[in-house]
Amino acid sequence: MIDKEALEFRLERLVYSQNMLSAWKRSKKEFIDKYIRRIFWSDDSQLDREYEENMSYGRDFHLMCQRILLGIEPIRSKSEFDRDLDRDLDRVRKIYRLYRERYGHDLSFLPEYTIELKDRIQVTYDLLIKIYEGGKLTRLDIWDWKTERKKIEKSNAEMKMQTRLYMYVCKESIGVDLECENIRMYYYQPAIDWQVMVDYTEDKHLSNRNMIYST
């Protein structure tokens, strides 16, 4: 058991991510076990091993995407696993090329970009794109890579804690001088070449603020 004083000490120093806020909403016990007591477990079942394999693929994919967007080509392999990875990375390269063809150099790519608000809320974007016109920031596009194959529907994407937190933090920081309508978030599933776009409004921003700080 963790005593009340130790619990309060750790809570006061936590920086809250999307996963942490989601865990808190689901179960206070899960949150305390995972983020305060730091209890993690594995049952070594087939399902558990498959989960670890998927997580490993996801980590590799995100790392390779970061390299591509920084202009560092990933190493290619001939294994079946890496052929899937190469295919998925080629689809991310296509997104990069389309932006370059449309906006030229009037944009900047920020892969694995972390923002922390002063009230200890933190997010790390897979990719944040700043789009400029005449040297002035005019739009922000958030991209999140999803390696699972189950199709993400727009209605579900709009209600995800991740969506609401990522868009809120973006508006409160880099996008503070932008209209909400100039901030967008995209979920992209390269394995099935599926993309969902979520737009933003002032009403959504106020709703997200209320949801986040009442969690």
Regions found by a protein language model. Give the residues of each.
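Short helix-terminating capping/connector loops at secondary-structure junctions
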Residues: G104-L107, K136-L137, V176-N182
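Active-site catalytic microenvironments for nucleophilic, acid-base chemistry
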Residues: R67-G71, Y168-S173
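Short catalytic/ligand-binding loop motif for oxyanion handling, primarily in non-cytosolic enzymes
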Residues: I32-D33, F40-W41, K150-I152, D193-V196
